[in-house]
């Protein structure tokens, strides 16, 4: 058998509108349960929904950002099923006339650039939230019921978990660029379900599709897909097709667990939402939105390469995160050194971000202070070792590095007579190293430079020490 994997994603994104999708209730995370509710989002008889125009605009922005076709007219539908978080007994969504269709995301880190098609992006309302307390009871919070969502459905074009993760990360960053959602998986504003099965390229054999829910982090998406891929491969090797089912990822056991047999579309008994009339979207409105879209990662990457003369790899990393790209441009504006700004950000700064286990947006250090540090280093007012030490201190404290290095006496010594005196002392104290250098062992120069730096208490210029040692010998 020549087994291949098929992976598709269904991604829900909560939109950052001020109010809910079909009523005037506030759209706010973390409020007292059941305070942001009204007869409309609770489904009381006679309460009529009305479309949130800002949510519609945000959905069109998303569609355009993923190169989708935007419908000029659409209707809303009722998706009917019984579950405690669905207080009305149905969800207002779109079944057969989605707002956006035929988009794509291009993956960059595959062996070659690969387009993953986006089948559709449709608008809908979110459901309530189940809260399980310590007593074993389940309580319902309907603050989330009616919050505007877009559901982004990909085609099953991904062939391994790495591609699926890259697709999800690329999608999240593009949504963040649009500023239509904070896309925080930890708060549920970005949620992902995955569909996976395997097939044999040499026959018509294929396993039945599994849908995995309860994926609340990029790590859980990757782990669930790796597990399911192995499970489906094993089924195929045993010539079994498995069951079409919905599963969930269990963090404790690091496995997927069956929740229920997967429902077919007609189980939901879709019907037209009669309380919301068909909506018409003028092409001029779509064009106006398109014209005002922010600069997206791909466009910004090209600009960074052309304007700042940095290489493609650095430009790609810098522009994947909108906050990082903005931060970089602020640093460049002050430091007037695009290359060194890129080197510091992608090197020592991101290293501190990773070591502190935070997001780049949570960093305290201002762009202004980082730029000042870069200028101090580039002007040789402090050496590289001192600059790195100051950065580690400044990362969390966010102080002015110019003031700090003066107060701490860290400015680099530029008195040639003093530097020569230190070199003379070190050379006199290390005759064996001098002999090694004269015998062709250049590594000993590094040792002598280190001794000079030690005597200067880190304030000397290592390049200058290197030159003076060679002249002395």
Swiss-Prot record:
Query: What superkingdom does the record give?
Result: Bacteria
Write down the InterPro entries for this protein, in alphabetical order.
Asn/Gln-tRNA_amidoTrfase_suB/E (IPR017959), Asn/Gln-tRNA_Trfase_suB/E_cat (IPR006075), Asn/Gln_amidotransferase (IPR018027), Asn/Gln_tRNA_amidoTrase-B-like (IPR003789), GatB (IPR004413), GatB_C_1 (IPR042114), GatB_Yqey_C_2 (IPR023168), Gln-tRNA_amidoTrfase_suB_CS (IPR017958)
Subunit structure and binding partners: Heterotrimer of A, B and C subunits.
EC number assigned by the record: 6.3.5.-
What keyword terms does UniProt attach to this protein? ATP-binding, Ligase, Nucleotide-binding, Protein biosynthesis
**Gene Ontology BP terms:** glutaminyl-tRNAGln biosynthesis via transamidation; translation
Q: Which organism is it from?
A: Finegoldia magna (strain ATCC 29328 / DSM 20472 / WAL 2508)
Q: Report the PROSITE patterns cross-referenced here.
A: GATB
Q: Quote the gene name from the UniProt entry.
A: gatB
Q: What class of enzyme is it?
A: ligase
Q: Name one GO molecular function term.
A: glutaminyl-tRNA synthase (glutamine-hydrolyzing) activity
Q: What family does the database annotate?
A: Belongs to the GatB/GatE family. GatB subfamily.
- Family matches, as Pfam families: GatB_N, GatB_Yqey
Official protein name in the record: Aspartyl/glutamyl-tRNA(Asn/Gln) amidotransferase subunit B
In UniProt terms, what function does this protein have?
Allows the formation of correctly charged Asn-tRNA(Asn) or Gln-tRNA(Gln) through the transamidation of misacylated Asp-tRNA(Asn) or Glu-tRNA(Gln) in organisms which lack either or both of asparaginyl-tRNA or glutaminyl-tRNA synthetases. The reaction takes place in the presence of glutamine and ATP through an activated phospho-Asp-tRNA(Asn) or phospho-Glu-tRNA(Gln).
> Which reaction(s) are listed as its catalytic activity?
L-glutamyl-tRNA(Gln) + L-glutamine + ATP + H2O = L-glutaminyl-tRNA(Gln) + L-glutamate + ADP + phosphate + H(+); L-aspartyl-tRNA(Asn) + L-glutamine + ATP + H2O = L-asparaginyl-tRNA(Asn) + L-glutamate + ADP + phosphate + 2 H(+)
Q: Which SMART domains match?
A: GatB_Yqey
């Amino acid at each position: 058998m020549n087994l291949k994997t098929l992976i598709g994603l269904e991604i829900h994104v909560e939109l950052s509108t001020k109010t809910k999708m079909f009523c005037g209730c506030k759209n706010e995370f973390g409020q007292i349960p059941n305070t942001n509710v009204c007869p409309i989002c609770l489904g009381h008889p006679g309460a009529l929904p009305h479309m949130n125009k800002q949510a519609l605009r945000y959905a069109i922005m998303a569609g355009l950002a993923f190169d989708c076709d935007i419908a000029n007219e659409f209707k809303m539908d009722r998706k009917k099923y019984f579950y405690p978080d669905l207080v009305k007994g149905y969800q207002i969504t779109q079944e057969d006339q989605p707002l956006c269709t035929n988009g794509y995301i291009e993956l960059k880190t595959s062996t070659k650039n690969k387009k993953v098609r986006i089948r559709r992006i449709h608008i809908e309302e979110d459901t309530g939230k189940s809260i399980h307390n310590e007593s074993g009871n389940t309580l319902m919070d309907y603050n989330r019921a009616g919050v505007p969502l877009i559901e982004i459905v990909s085609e099953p074009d991904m062939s391994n978990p790495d591609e699926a993760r890259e697709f999800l990360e690329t999608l999240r960053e593009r949504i963040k660029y649009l500023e239509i959602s904070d896309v925080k998986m930890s708060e549920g504003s970005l949620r992902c379900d995955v569909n996976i099965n395997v097939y044999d390229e040499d026959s018509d054999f294929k396993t039945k599709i599994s849908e995995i829910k309860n994926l609340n982090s990029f790590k859980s998406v990757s782990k669930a897909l790796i597990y399911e891929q192995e499970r489906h491969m094993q089924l195929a090797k045993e010539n079994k097709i498995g069951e079409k089912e919905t599963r969930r990822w269990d963090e404790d056991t690091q496995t997927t667990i069956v929740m229920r047999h997967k429902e077919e579309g007609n189980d939901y008994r879709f019907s037209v939402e009669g309380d919301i009339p068909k909506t018409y979207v003028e092409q001029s409105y779509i064009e106006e939105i398109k014209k005002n879209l922010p600069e997206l990662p791909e466009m910004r990457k090209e600009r960074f390469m052309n304007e700042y003369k940095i290489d493609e790899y650095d430009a790609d990393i810098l522009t994947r995160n909108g906050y990082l790209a903005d931060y970089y441009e602020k640093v460049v504006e002050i430091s007037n050194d695009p290359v060194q700004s890129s080197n510091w950000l992608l090197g020592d700064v991101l290293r501190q971000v990773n070591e502190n286990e935070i997001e780049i947006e949570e960093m305290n250090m201002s762009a202004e202070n980082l730029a000042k540090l870069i200028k101090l280093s580039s002007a040789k007012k402090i050496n590289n070792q001192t600059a790195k030490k100051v950065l580690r201190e400044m990362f969390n404290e966010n102080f002015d590095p110019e003031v700090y290095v003066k107060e701490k006496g860290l400015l680099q010594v530029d008195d040639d007579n003093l530097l020569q005196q230190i070199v003379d002392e070190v050379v006199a104290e290390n005759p064996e190293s001098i002999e090694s250098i004269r015998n062709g062992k250049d590594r000993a120069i590094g040792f002598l430079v280190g001794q000079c730096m030690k005597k200067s208490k880190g304030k000397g210029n290592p390049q200058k020490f290197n030159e003076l040692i060679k002249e002395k010998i």
